[in-house]
UniProtKB/Swiss-Prot annotation, chains A, B:
This is S-adenosylmethionine decarboxylase proenzyme. Signal peptide: none annotated. Binds 1 pyruvoyl group covalently per subunit. Pfam families: AdoMet_dc. The record marks E70, S71 as: Cleavage (non-hydrolytic). It comes from Pyrobaculum islandicum (strain DSM 4184 / JCM 9189 / GEO3). One of its GO terms (molecular function) is adenosylmethionine decarboxylase activity. Is synthesized initially as an inactive proenzyme. Formation of the active enzyme involves a self-maturation process in which the active site pyruvoyl group is generated from an internal serine residue via an autocatalytic post-translational modification. Two non-identical subunits are generated from the proenzyme in this reaction, and the pyruvate is formed at the N-terminus of the alpha chain, which is derived from the carboxyl end of the proenzyme. SUPFAM superfamilies: S-adenosylmethionine decarboxylase. It comes from the Archaea. The active site is at S71, H76, C91. GO terms for cellular component: cytosol.
Amino acid sequence: MAGGVGARVVVGRHIYGNLYGCDPQILRDESALITIIKEATKIANAMLLSVGSYRFGPNGGLTVFAIVAESHISIHTWPEYGFATVDVYTCGDHTDPKAAFDYIVSKLKPQKVEAFFGDRSMYKE
Amino acid sequence: MAGGVGARVVVGRHIYGNLYGCDPQILRDESALITIIKEATKIANAMLLSVGSYRFGPNGGLTVFAIVAESHISIHTWPEYGFATVDVYTCGDHTDPKAAFDYIVSKLKPQKVEAFFGDRSMYKE
């Protein structure tokens, strides 16, 4: 988890991905996605503050969102294409955003995953 | 705004940044940040569904979050370090996430900005 130089004042790690060929049934299942994001919060070792979900468009697409004390986790879905995007962004050495990301991916059952890492740390200058 | 090959089925653009040396007064001003994120939603040409804000820790740090029909916008702040992170992730050719990101940055008055682009599009395979 590289990036920057010097000591980190704030440790922030953001794992995000674009998921192709997911199970469309799960992508339109609001309560399943809420359960998944809550479980992911625990796996990340983050403290859940709030979960919200919103359905958009005529095809059952969903946004499911968790605000955690350590930042946020989101899932956006396009069931009509089997496509979803996932963000797990948590702060603090005590958190494990990669494990939470991998858990969400395992539940959405994609055929292909494009995963990326964003360093959201603050470095001492 | 590169990435992938072939036609885009879903257009998703995610601009995110780490902001150093921001005005600490603004970073702990919940109502100011809510006003800023609402205005950013308009500038992005996105449709606002919900705004939430959460204060965390003893130093007045805030998370301000906007769910839009086209994905999400977030601001996380650490006033004690003058540090903030900003994400503007919107879907659709009609949106302008870069303009919204630049607007938020202008309001937080950082001395240094690390900005990144994440392609969240789905490409035809």
